[in-house]
């Protein structure tokens, strides 16, 4: 029999969330789960889901098929709140998971204390990817705000990765001598005026940079 929906088990960690979810379901011949995740995790979860399906089959004898939905983290959170029947949610920001708890009432408000490391199963740093030979001489955040430099980053209104990019740029600006929130905001303004395209997610931004050839540098996840 298929799994029944267990929406309160939404979590930021697929590995733990799936194990939690299946505890509440009767074993049967088939099962289908939907993992709603953020943009750049498609290949990771495609491989991980196959591993989990093999593990679950060996443990219970039950076949499980895991469907995937990917997009900007903020956009995905709103889609789930609006009714997308997710079994598992893996998003880029605690802020987006909080929205599921506060606006969607889909999990407890204290979800972040439920698992180790504040329920964050993995981390990444932010890196710059430049054109071959780095013709614009981009070395640090300050270079991104220089005239004539095109920067590719997703839209922070829809992408969790873009919000991390924004926060990393803000943190750099606040570490500069004599920095104030006003000078940091001015720096961010100059940086974003150098962004020719604000895609909705990290994958679309990578396509813009790598396939469409737009931009001198892309701000992206290391992993």
Question: Where would I find each of the regions flagged by the language model?
Answer:
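N-terminal secretory signal peptides that target proteins for export/translocation
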Residues: 1-7
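Bacterial N-terminal signal peptides
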Residues: 9-23
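Short, well-ordered coil/turn elements that cap or connect secondary structure elements
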Residues: 28, 61-63, 123, 146, ...
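Early extracytoplasmic/lumenal segment of secretory-pathway proteins
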Residues: 28-103, 113-115, 221
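Extracytoplasmic/secreted envelope proteins and their assembly/folding machinery
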Residues: 42-49, 53, 73-77, 81, ...
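Alpha-to-beta junction loops
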Residues: 83-90, 148-150, 211-220
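A conserved helix-loop-strand patch within extracytoplasmic ligand-binding domains
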Residues: 101-175
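Ligand-binding pocket segment of bilobal, Venus flytrap-like solute-binding proteins
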Residues: 176-223
């Amino acid at each position: 029999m298929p799994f029944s929906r267990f929406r309160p088990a939404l979590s930021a960690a697929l590995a733990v969330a799936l194990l939690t979810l299946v505890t509440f379901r009767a074993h049967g011949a088939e099962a289908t789960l939907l993992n709603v995740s953020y943009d750049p995790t498609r290949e990771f979860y495609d491989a991980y889901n196959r591993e989990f399906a093999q593990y679950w089959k060996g443990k219970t004898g039950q076949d499980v098929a895991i469907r995937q939905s990917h997009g900007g983290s903020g956009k995905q959170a709103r889609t789930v709140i609006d009714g997308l029947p997710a079994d598992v949610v893996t998003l880029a920001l605690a802020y987006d998971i909080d929205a599921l708890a506060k606006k969607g009432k889909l999990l407890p408000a204290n979800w972040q204390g439920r698992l180790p490391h504040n329920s964050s199963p993995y981390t990444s740093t932010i890196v710059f990817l430049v054109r071959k030979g780095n013709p614009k001489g981009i070395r640090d955040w300050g270079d991104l705000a220089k005239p004539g430099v095109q920067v590719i980053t997703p839209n922070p209104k829809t992408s969790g990765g873009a919000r991390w990019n924004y926060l990393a740029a803000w943190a750099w600006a606040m570490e500069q001598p004599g920095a104030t929130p006003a000078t940091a905001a001015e720096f961010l303004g100059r940086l974003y005026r150098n962004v020719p395209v604000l895609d909705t997610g990290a994958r679309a931004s990578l396509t813009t940079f790598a396939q469409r050839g737009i931009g001198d540098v892309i701000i992206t996840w290391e992993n």
